[in-house]
């Protein structure tokens, strides 16, 4: 079997390391530009630096909100969305309060997703709804996914940090043969071309990874 090529413009390079330095963030952006990736995913505090570094590139700048817990208040999430928009972000990946969803409080989840979509559309930001699917029942994961489709969110991320087998299980729970306007994202710790190919065959559009891109020049 021949070598599987990576489609770099469908990869999001992330650095959500709490101890990442400005040097690490600069390296992230430089490598992403060199590989012509889809976007970079970073904490809100790094948005001004990344906005400057990515100014003349085609990459999108994506800021993560309420990672990993999702339990910030809705008001604080919207405030951060407004702030990163001013700083130069093109998109946000927002972790919803999936603990509430786990408890069966679907109204809280639906209302939050609707409010997040309204806030991002007002700011003309792309929105990825994110959660930690490994602690949710399939019916809860599907509910969040369908609610995201209903409000016209741009993408859905079922986990950040899950193992490959966990990710595949989550994708199986929500993916369908029907064409949907929302992009399905999946996390991979290492950028393994065969794993990416498998996820793509399952309906995944975008790979989110904190792996070393320089290994795939």
Where are these regions (language model features)?
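Conserved N-terminal beta1-alpha1 strand-loop-helix module at the mouth
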Residues: 1-86, 147
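Active-site-adjacent beta->alpha loops and helix N-cap segments on the catalytic face
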Residues: 42-59, 72-78, 99-119, 135-141, ...
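Helix C-cap/helix->beta junction micro-motif
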Residues: 35, 57, 122-123, 151, ...
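Hydrophobic faces of well-ordered beta-strands that scaffold small-molecule active sites
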Residues: 6-15, 38-42, 59-66, 90-94, ...
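Conserved mixed alpha/beta catalytic, RNA-binding, or beta-rich assembly cores of soluble enzyme
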Residues: 62, 76-80, 85, 91, ...
């Amino acid at each position: 079997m021949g070598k599987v090529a990576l489609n770099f413009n469908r990869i999001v390079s992330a650095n959500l390391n709490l101890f990442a330095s400005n040097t690490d963030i600069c390296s992230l952006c430089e490598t992403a530009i060199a590989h012509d990736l889809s976007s970079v995913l970073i904490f809100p505090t790094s948005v001004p630096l990344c906005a400057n570094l990515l100014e003349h590139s085609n990459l999108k700048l994506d800021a993560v909100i309420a990672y990993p817990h999702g339990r910030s208040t809705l008001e604080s999430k919207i405030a951060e969305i407004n702030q990163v928009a001013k700083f130069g972000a093109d998109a946000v990946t927002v972790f919803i309060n999936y603990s509430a969803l786990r408890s069966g409080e679907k109204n809280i989840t639906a209302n939050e997703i609707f409010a997040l979509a309204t806030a991002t559309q007002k700011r003309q930001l792309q929105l990825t709804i994110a959660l930690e699917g490994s602690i949710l029942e399939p019916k809860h994961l599907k509910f969040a996914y369908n609610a995201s489709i209903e409000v016209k969110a741009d993408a859905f991320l079922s986990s950040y940090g899950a193992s490959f087998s966990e990710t595949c299980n989550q994708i199986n729970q929500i993916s369908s043969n029907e064409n949907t306007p929302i992009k399905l994202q999946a996390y991979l710790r290492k950028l393994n071309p065969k794993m990416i190919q498998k996820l793509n065959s399952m309906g995944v559009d975008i790979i989110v990874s904190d792996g070393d891109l320089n290994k795939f020049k």
